[in-house]
Amino acid sequence: MRFSDNLAKILDKYENLGNTLSSGIMGDEFVKASKEYAELEDVVAKIKEYNKAKSELEEANNFKLEVGLDNATLEMIEDEIYTLENSLPKLERAVKIALLPKDDADSKSAIIEVRAGSGGEEAALFAAVLFNMYQRYAELKGWRFEILAISDTGIGGYKEASASIKGKDVFSKLKFESGVHRVQRVPETESQGRIHTSAATVAVLPEAEEVDIKIEDKDLRIDTYRASGAGGQHVNTTDSAVRITHIPTGITVALQDEKSQHKNKAKALKILRARIYEEERRKKEQERADSRRGQVGSGDRSERIRTYNFPQGRVSDHRINLTLYKIDEVVKNGQLDEFVEALIADDEAKKLLEI
């Protein structure tokens, strides 16, 4: 089917859905039609803009052929033709991007998990830096950042930390952050001024609702124990810490941040549901023809994706060969948009090649 025929078909479908919604349908039929109609709104707006530019270009070319035009009018028409001819490829690309298959999880909120990797205490300190960077980015975007759990080292580092980030399209923005982040800097305890390299792992999971993942009580094993602080000492006398294991998948989540066992259980279930949902998404995507490996930000947590070099003041993303020499703005102020937008654009470009 030709590109123009495909666009006409989409416009017809949109119009028919609008007529259906106006006909007074109710119940599940109305819900289904409303959902389809809303999903098409963005692409239809882009198609109409593209068709309008094509029509205006055709009119301008026809007008140019008319006899008796003065030089000023002819120059004005040629300027318009030049502008329209330059805008059409961009408008066509915007339509094609809007037509790309959507990741159902893109519109969801997210759970982010940061874990210290190789590098000992320096890695734990870097994990804390990354976690705080994402918190500041969430604040800049107007998202709600709720800390779920932090396992600290007692001197400012995080062995691991997790948070729920709520807002529109959070997962679509943050999903490319999954992977190994490497830091190169001189630790405060380094007397010789030598640069040390350490790493932390980031995992970004779409936050799953109960409607996405149904977890049966019979599939859970819940253990309770006393919470412990740094050094292993018990910090309270009740069994408030919770460990939940999803028996079918073997996925386990342990939480002890809250003094209330009930709150720890609720947070642990939230993380567990997100991990199970992400595992199911991964399996489905691997079954599809589109290999995850062929896309930017595959989400492979063993993939080294970014290096933060403090002595040189640079942050380099290895997937798209983008280096920014403003490490403080990125790390301390959470200004991640240049990386986020570049990764999304690169992902879209690769998908367009597959059409």
Swiss-Prot record:
Its main location: cytoplasm. One of its GO terms (cellular component) is cytoplasm. It comes from the Bacteria. GO terms for molecular function: translation release factor activity, codon specific. Methylated by PrmC. Methylation increases the termination efficiency of RF1. The keyword Iron does not apply. Residues 280-308 are annotated as: Disordered. The modification N5-methylglutamine is found at Q233. It holds the Pfam family RF-1. Residues 280-293 have a biased composition (Basic and acidic residues). It is found in: Cytoplasm. Keywords: Cytoplasm, Methylation, Protein biosynthesis. InterPro entries: PCRF, Pep_chain_release_fac_I, Pep_chain_release_fac_I_sf, Prokaryotic/Mito_RF, RF-1. The keyword Cytoplasm applies. Belongs to the prokaryotic/mitochondrial release factor family. Peptide chain release factor 1 directs the termination of translation in response to the peptide chain termination codons UAG and UAA. PANTHER family: LD18447P. This is Peptide chain release factor 1.
